[in-house]
């Protein structure tokens, strides 16, 4: 497993980890072990001492009254990919965070508000249409909200080329209404 610490207010409060094998290999292995009663490999293993719905991965990168825009993604690898591909390491105005899944909680919203964030870009995976809509409705009363519309629903941020990521942020940032209309038209 590759292990990542979860840091909140400068303190390590937990960890998330992901197996180094690709999902397909884990699934193949687990299908074989199912009948033998052997150990099943988990793709993700997280610490259990914290409620992850109250935390944001990379939250300490959001600077109080300095970070105007936050890109909200699902997981750790999304944040790493966005930070690397958009070169956000030393950018005080934009940061990427993860909600550890496809939901955003009231506590996570409050954390972003408390740092003075004004704009949130929802960067959930392309296959998470309903989750994006729900998150947008939850965020809209507090922030200016945009959705990063990933054209290929089967790809995550780490699978997209740098030029594709820049293209999404240059040409495919949609308002909540534009996103909903687009998804209705695609049906």
Which residues are covered by each model-predicted region?
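Short hydrophobic alpha-helical runs that function as membrane-insertion/retention elements
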Residues: 95-98, 119-123, 146
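Short, surface-exposed amphipathic charged segments that create phosphate/polyanion-binding patches used
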Residues: 110-116, 155-171
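Short, aromatic/basic amphipathic alpha-helical patches
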Residues: 131-142
């Amino acid at each position: 497993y590759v292990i990542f610490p979860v840091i909140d207010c400068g303190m390590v409060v937990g960890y998330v980890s992901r197996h180094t094998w690709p999902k397909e290999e884990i699934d193949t292995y687990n299908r074989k072990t199912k009948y033998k009663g052997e150990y099943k490999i988990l793709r993700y293993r997280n610490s259990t001492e914290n409620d992850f719905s109250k935390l944001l991965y990379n939250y300490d990168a959001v600077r109080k009254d300095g970070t105007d825009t936050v890109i909200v993604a699902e997981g750790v690898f999304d944040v790493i990919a966005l930070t690397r591909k958009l070169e956000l390491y030393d950018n005080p105005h934009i940061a990427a965070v993860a909600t550890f899944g496809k939901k955003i909680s009231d506590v996570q919203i409050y954390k972003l508000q408390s740092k003075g964030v004004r704009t949130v870009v929802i960067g959930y995976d392309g296959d998470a249409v309903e989750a994006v809509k729900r998150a947008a409705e939850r965020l809209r009363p507090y922030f200016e909200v945009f959705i990063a519309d990933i054209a290929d629903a089967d790809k995550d941020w780490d699978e997209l080329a740098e030029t594709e990521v820049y293209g999404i942020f240059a040409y495919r940032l949609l308002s909540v209404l534009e996103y909903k209309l687009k998804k209705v038209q695609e049906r």
